[in-house]
Amino acid sequence: MTANHDALVEAVFPLEGKALPRDHAQALQHALAEQLPWLRSDAGAGIHPLKLVSGPESLALLSQRTRLILRVDANRLDELKALCGVELDVSGHALRLGAVHLRALQPLATLYAYRVAAVGADESEFMQAMEAELTELAIAGERVCGKRQSLRRDGLDMTTFSMMLHGLVPEQSLRLQQHGLGPHRLLGCGLFVPHKSAAAVGV
């Protein structure tokens, strides 16, 4: 399905729950797609990584401030409202959604992605691939590659890198947030958000 990139917003849900597996991205994707089947075919949709606190063994803990944020078409609001009170089963852990509110994308000069999917572990090859995508999107600004991480997908480890761009003009900032970089938006990859400091990529 072709995405209406101009209509993309952030849909923010409060959460009730205790813990999730540290590597929960694919399980969360599946749980949400059961409630919103169109997520699987909507090219513009994305699920932001959850901000969790390290817990015992292989668990990560939710805090009172943890939010589920989806990047979706604003025209889906009625379907998103229907999720209020729904309990997701994420690898055997319960996650209850609160009432959604929408937040517009902000055209800030500095954008950060917690993870962008890479074909391999080589940073220079990753940056070359990103440069090609950014050129196609006509996006300038300074690029900074950050931390290499791994993400479980279909039982295998996938390499990702964090990434920051700064010095963007408003039109470029919105375009990058609307289109993203690389694949796997529903695993939280390639989704850029406004950020205040370039120091974050090294964290």
Task: Specify the residue positions occupied by each region the protein language model found.
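RNA-interacting cores
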Residues: M1-V203
